[in-house]
Amino acid sequence: IGTQIVXNXMKSIKNIQKITKAMKMV
């Protein structure tokens, strides 16, 4: 269960980083 939570957190962090990069580009 713990590993799934970590994986989900990593995915969410990557998504947030993509959004922040897109915002910076604009």
UniProtKB/Swiss-Prot annotation:
Keywords: ATP synthesis, CF(1), Hydrogen ion transport, Ion transport, Membrane, Mitochondrion, Mitochondrion inner membrane, Transport. The keyword Isomerase does not apply. The keyword Metal-binding does not apply. It is found in: Mitochondrion; Mitochondrion inner membrane. Its main location: mitochondrion. Mitochondrial membrane ATP synthase (F(1)F(0) ATP synthase or Complex V) produces ATP from ADP in the presence of a proton gradient across the membrane which is generated by electron transport complexes of the respiratory chain. F-type ATPases consist of two structural domains, F(1) - containing the extramembraneous catalytic core, and F(0) - containing the membrane proton channel, linked together by a central stalk and a peripheral stalk. During catalysis, ATP synthesis in the catalytic domain of F(1) is coupled via a rotary mechanism of the central stalk subunits to proton translocation. Belongs to the ATPase gamma chain family. F-type ATPases have 2 components, CF(1) - the catalytic core - and CF(0) - the membrane proton channel. CF(1) has five subunits: alpha(3), beta(3), gamma(1), delta(1), epsilon(1). CF(0) has three main subunits: a, b and c. This is ATP synthase subunit gamma, mitochondrial.
